[in-house]
From Swiss-Prot:
Oligomer status and interactors: Part of the 30S ribosomal subunit.
Protein's recorded name: Small ribosomal subunit protein uS10
Gene name for this UniProt entry: rpsJ
A Pfam family matched in the record: Ribosomal_S10
Species in which this protein is naturally found: Chromohalobacter salexigens (strain ATCC BAA-138 / DSM 3043 / CIP 106854 / NCIMB 13768 / 1H11)
HAMAP family the record matches: Ribosomal_uS10
Amino acid sequence: MQNQKIRIRLKAFDHRLIDQSAQEIVDTAKRTGAQVRGPIPLPTNRERYTVLISPHVNKDARDQYEIRTHKRVLDIVEPTEKTVDALMKLDLAAGVDVQIKLD
């Protein structure tokens, strides 16, 4: 697996959860002898929704909601077989979306 790179993208709504998951991945990769770059924070997406409170009149009465999507990127340079096996067995939190890419 020489001259390869694993890129891991993490997405979550809770920044504490994504930081904890990123730290678990970094610890696992370093324990197996791989070199890690990151976690690199990417820009946070903020989606805002405005909802009318009143069912009939009062156009001024509105509620605003927001959901933030936090993202992180990790690069694992020169992974070993142990690194790949350990990452496959790693159990991360349920609220974190993980995308793994081999380059």
